[in-house]
């Protein structure tokens, strides 16, 4: 782990994959348990803030930039005391939603405007998801390692992939567009996918409503990029 003090209000921390592994954290965890993530960030702050210049009654913000080699964490004072009025803006709920949303955008290579786009992207280009008919496979995975293995094996064509977590299990939703890929080709890809998990009776609508979406649109490609 490397630390650089940018100025009196900002610290940059570089954490390699080995540093994350030693602390029991993976890049995927940054999309999961919000309380665990917040505790992790504050534990890093405790490690690097030897002079205690970040007072405990000061609001702190965290910005995360993941990379293939780990992540870069910017820790900044917000310049606001945690009095009653400030607490309304920096309570646990606010922190829980803001930090993971930012990380999710970085992992998926999206900005805020991209999230409003209704186009689906597969590894071969852009597909108009609103107009295209769809064939869907919902796959329940034994664990995250099976998802990584599947991502290494399957180069999805003519569709998109979304990863969810629901009731302590991982689910991969593969959506194919018949106007982009033949039925035989789609079934061949689904057959490969089912070597790594079990077909689930759950629908993508249920997962979207009640589950936690970890990777959107190009989950397989994202996994190959970050989990080589």
Swiss-Prot record:
MF (Gene Ontology): protein-macromolecule adaptor activity
Disulfide bond sites: none
Superkingdom of origin: Bacteria
InterPro entries according to UniProt: MecA_C_sf, Neg-reg_MecA
PANTHER family: ADAPTER PROTEIN MECA, ADAPTER PROTEIN MECA 1
Function: Enables the recognition and targeting of unfolded and aggregated proteins to the ClpC protease or to other proteins involved in proteolysis.
The record's note on its domains: The N-terminal domain probably binds unfolded/aggregated proteins; the C-terminal domain interacts with ClpC.
Family assignment from sequence similarity: Belongs to the MecA family.
Official protein name in the record: Adapter protein MecA
Originating species: Lacticaseibacillus paracasei (strain ATCC 334 / BCRC 17002 / CCUG 31169 / CIP 107868 / KCTC 3260 / NRRL B-441) (Lactobacillus paracasei)
Lineage of source species: Bacteria, Bacillati, Bacillota, Bacilli, Lactobacillales
Gene behind this protein: mecA
């Amino acid at each position: 782990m490397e630390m650089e003090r940018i100025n009196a209000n900002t610290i940059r921390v570089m954490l390699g994959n080995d540093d994350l592994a030693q602390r029991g954290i993976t890049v995927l965890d940054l999309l999961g348990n919000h309380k665990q993530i917040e505790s992790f960030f504050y534990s890093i702050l405790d490690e690097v803030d030897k002079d205690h210049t970040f007072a405990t009654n000061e609001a702190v913000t965290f910005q995360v930039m993941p990379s293939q080699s780990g992540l870069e964490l910017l820790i900044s004072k917000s310049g606001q005391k945690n009095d009653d009025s400030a607490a309304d803006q920096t309570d646990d709920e606010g922190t829980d939603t803001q930090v993971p949303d930012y990380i999710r955008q970085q992992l998926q290579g999206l900005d805020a405007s991209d999230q409003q786009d209704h186009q689906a992207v597969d590894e071969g280009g852009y597909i108009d998801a609103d107009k295209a008919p769809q064939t869907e496979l919902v796959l329940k995975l034994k664990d995250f390692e099976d998802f990584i293995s599947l991502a290494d094996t399957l180069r999805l064509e003519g569709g998109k992939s979304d990863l969810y977590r629901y009731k302590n299990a991982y689910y991969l939703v593969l959506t194919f567009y018949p106007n982009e890929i033949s039925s035989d080709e789609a079934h061949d890809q689904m057959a490969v996918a089912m070597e790594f998990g079990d077909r689930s009776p759950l629908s993508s609508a249920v997962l979207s409503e009640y589950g936690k979406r970890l990777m959107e649109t190009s989950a397989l490609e994202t996994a190959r990029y970050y989990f080589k």
